[in-house]
Amino acid sequence: XXXGLXIVDAFVQPNLILQGDAKVEDNGXL
């Protein structure tokens, strides 16, 4: 998420940090 877990999102989707962040925030609120 972008709200402080951007690093985690970067590991989840290193090629789609912004999009992955948005999806994680939207689906899991991470």
Curated annotation (Swiss-Prot):
Keywords: Alpha-amylase inhibitor, Lectin
Keyword rRNA processing: no
GO MF, one example: carbohydrate binding
Family: Belongs to the leguminous lectin family.
Function in brief: Lectin and alpha-amylase inhibitor. Acts as a defensive protein against insects.
Name by which UniProt lists this protein: Putative alpha-amylase inhibitor
